[in-house]
Amino acid sequence: MRFAYKYRLYPNRAQVHFLENQLHEACDLYNAALQERRDAWKVCRKSINYYDQANQLKPMRAEGLIGLANFSCCQDVLRRLDKTFQAFFARVRRGERPGFPRFRSFRRYDSITFPSYGNGCRLLDDGKLRIQGVGLIKIKLHRPVRGRDQDRYDQAGRESLVRVFFRRARHRRVTGVEQGDRP
């Protein structure tokens, strides 16, 4: 079973600026990866997948072309694009109106995902959140976070700077009794 916990962040002005810069970088990476896939197909009739683009991340970061602080965030951006293309091709196979993947504006790209707990983002015991490159951010923990740490995913959204933790809990057997005359 998966639970989502949503908490509000209270960053200072410099931290807000850094998080918005990371959103810009993630959006630019998404659009550049989409452009690369489109151009490769138009010019060479070559299909590019996630692994082809993920192999380019390390050299691009070494040259300073990508400014995202966390490598896993870059990989997640490419995974998002790959899921978009998989959904597009699935709609084509089903004969539905496909809707080719579009470029995203900064306004529509509103979250950064840290795919694994501790890799770029960690919740500390004193009620603060440590984000790689940003530092400690105050967070209002209005209810306790339960579940296993290794299965937590963190997202930083632009709208009112909210942090969402997804946690897995052990599956409990649930028994229910329903009364009434509805089938």
Language-model features, listed with the residues they occupy:
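Nucleic-acid substrate recognition interfaces
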Residues: M1-P183
